[in-house]
């Protein structure tokens, strides 16, 4: 329930009180009117009983009265006895006045001579008539007092001076004169002779009473009012019942409307207080929500930054790993960071499973380093030029390679029992190539734990793109130039001497054209030379001499040897290599 409903209920109560007051006033008026009507009915009934028979006569005798002015002089003394009939005259007029009004106009002059004769012979009638000529004027105002005849009285009031409407009054006097007993009863009911002022006030009261009676509904307004009052009270009761149901903790014993309204006001005030509290709570929660959203955004931003860092680390690790695991033609970035030794050892440990994929040449070389056993796989690869052979020994464990290579170091070079078909041309290094250009990248191993990475970027035009890694070499270095056909090949051997390397070059497996191989050698006491086939005329040789410098002399090779940890030999046809110490 809202305040508007309570205000409406209060207005309704006020309106109800006003209606009750009006009803009381109206009942008083109706009671007074009923009393007046009863008095008038009594007077009318008495007049009718006394004058039922002579009512017809006045119509014939009414016109002669105005012609009686000559009669007053002979009867001056009897005016004292006549006043009694004067007071009685107006009462019968009230009932008979409507009847004589229409007839008087047609009978003014016709009866003038006739009634005068019979009136004069009357003994008592003549003087009575002469006195009543002036008397009817003051007695006439009493006619308007009765309420039921108000419309007729209005019509008769304006012609107060005319004698025609007043003519019927004297006729009853003649009939009442022989009955003096009735006159005293009627006289006390009549008020004193009215004056002109009372004549003016009486019509106004009659108009009001007539308007009240003429209103639509009349007496039926009371029934309508009662129905409306019942409906109003039923509606009000229903409203209070609804209010009771909506208000909690209402005491059933207190059934008064006032208590219900007070309880409703208190409940409304409590609801308003709760509403304000809830609004404050909503504002606080909104502020907390905004703060939480800001914090969440900050955490998301921080998380995205961490994800970026982790992604960068992952990419760096992937790019930093040697690309021997998967074949690709992509160019490595220059100046790339060195890889930790732990990662290198892990990579070295991955070598044995990969050896299983390359069955015959690699296994033979890992287990049987002497050259006498290696020529076995020659039959499967008889053709020299279409493919270049490469063996990735970097995958082999260091422990296996060390003992195997320490023993063959003093051994003499084995006889070239199985000369490779790729060794035929003389002008080439150790093995001639049919055609095409490439670069030669040499890898040497040493007992040093660290790794020196050399990144060599070569444009794809003359040859393939290769990444070379050079590590410090052992005391007995060896340099190998491996030939290949236009497809880029990678050759890895473990020779004790150059002849041994040349002899093994013909037995190495082949790689397809787009392959670029990079290796990191993890050996402590053996020599490793990795050669990548390239163009016939140009070649790049990288070596690390420890005890004595050794240079491979060839008419097509330009070499530089320096007693430094790293020796870089460049060819004029390729870009300069970049070396980094790990």
From Swiss-Prot:
Region span, Leucine-zipper: 271-299
Record GO terms (molecular function): chromatin binding; DNA-binding transcription factor activity; DNA-binding transcription factor activity, RNA polymerase II-specific; DNA-binding transcription repressor activity, RNA polymerase II-specific; identical protein binding; protein dimerization activity; RNA polymerase II cis-regulatory region sequence-specific DNA binding; RNA polymerase II transcription regulatory region sequence-specific DNA binding
Acidic residues composition-biased segments: 334-345
N-acetylserine: residues bearing it: 2
Compositional bias ranges of the Pro residues kind: 61-82, 99-108, 135-149, 160-171, 368-381, 409-418
Residues in bHLH domain copies: 220-271
Pfam families (UniProt xref): HLH (PF00010)
Function, in words: Binds DNA as a heterodimer with MAX and represses transcription. Binds to the canonical E box sequence 5'-CACGTG-3' and, with higher affinity, to 5'-CACGCG-3'.
Record's protein name: Max-binding protein MNT
Organism: Homo sapiens
Gene expressing this chain: MNT
């Amino acid at each position: 329930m809202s305040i508007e409903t309570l205000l409406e209920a209060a207005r309704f109560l006020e309106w109800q009180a006003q209606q009750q007051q009006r009803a009381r006033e109206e009942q008083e008026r109706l009671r007074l009117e009923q009393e007046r009507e009863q008095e008038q009915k009594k007077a009318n009934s008495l007049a009718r009983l006394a004058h039922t028979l002579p009512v017809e006569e006045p119509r014939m005798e009414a016109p002669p009265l105005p012609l009686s002015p000559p009669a007053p002089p002979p009867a001056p003394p009897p005016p004292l006895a006549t006043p009694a009939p004067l007071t009685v005259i107006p009462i019968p007029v009230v009932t008979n006045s409507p009847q004589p009004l229409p007839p008087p106009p047609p009978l003014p002059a016709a009866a003038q001579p006739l009634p005068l004769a019979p009136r004069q012979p009357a003994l008592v009638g003549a003087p009575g008539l002469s006195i009543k000529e002036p008397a009817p004027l003051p007695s006439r105002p009493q006619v308007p007092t009765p309420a039921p005849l108000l419309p007729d009285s209005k019509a008769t009031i304006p012609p107060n001076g005319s004698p025609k409407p007043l003519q019927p009054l004297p006729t009853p006097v003649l009939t009442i004169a022989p009955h003096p007993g009735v006159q005293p009863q009627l006289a006390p009911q009549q008020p004193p002779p009215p004056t002109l002022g009372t004549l003016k006030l009486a019509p106004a009261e009659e108009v009001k009473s007539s308007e009240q009676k003429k209103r639509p509904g009349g007496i039926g307004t009371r029934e309508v009012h009662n129905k409306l009052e019942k409906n109003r009270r039923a509606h009000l009761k229903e409203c209070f019942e609804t209010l009771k149901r909506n208000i909690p903790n209402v005491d059933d014993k207190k059934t008064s409307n006032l208590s219900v309204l007070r309880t409703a006001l208190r409940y409304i005030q409590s609801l308003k207080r709760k509403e304000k509290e809830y609004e404050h709570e909503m504002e606080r929660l909104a502020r907390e929500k905004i703060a939480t959203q800001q914090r969440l955004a900050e955490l998301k931003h921080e998380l995205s930054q961490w994800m970026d860092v982790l992604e960068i680390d992952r990419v760096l690790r992937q790019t930093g790993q040697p690309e021997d695991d998967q074949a690709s033609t992509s160019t490595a970035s220059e100046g790339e960071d060195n890889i930790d030794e732990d990662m290198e050892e892990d990579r070295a440990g991955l070598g044995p499973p990969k050896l299983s994929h390359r069955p015959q040449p690699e296994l033979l070389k890992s287990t049987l380093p002497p050259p006498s056993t290696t020529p076995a796989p020659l039959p499967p690869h008889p053709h020299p030029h279409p493919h270049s052979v490469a063996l990735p020994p970097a995958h082999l464990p260091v422990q296996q390679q060390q003992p195997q290579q320490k023993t063959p170091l003093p051994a003499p070079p084995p006889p070239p029992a199985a000369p490779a078909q790729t060794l035929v041309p003389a002008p080439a290094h150790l093995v001639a190539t049919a055609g095409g250009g490439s670069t030669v990248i040499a890898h040497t191993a040493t007992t040093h734990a660290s790794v020196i990475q050399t990144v060599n970027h070569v444009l794809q035009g003359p040859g393939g793109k290769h990444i070379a890694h050079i590590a410090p070499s052992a005391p007995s270095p060896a340099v190998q130039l491996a030939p290949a056909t236009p497809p880029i090949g990678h050759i890895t051997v473990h020779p004790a001497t150059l002849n041994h390397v040349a002899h093994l070059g013909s037995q190495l497996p082949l790689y397809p054209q787009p392959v670029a191989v990079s290796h990191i050698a993890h050996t402590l006491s053996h020599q490793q030379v990795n050669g990548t086939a390239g163009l016939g005329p140009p070649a790049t040789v990288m070596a690390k001499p420890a005890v004595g410098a050794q240079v491979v002399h060839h008419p097509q090779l330009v070499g530089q040897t320096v007693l430094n940890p790293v020796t870089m030999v460049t060819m004029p046809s390729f870009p300069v290599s970049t070396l980094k110490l790990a």
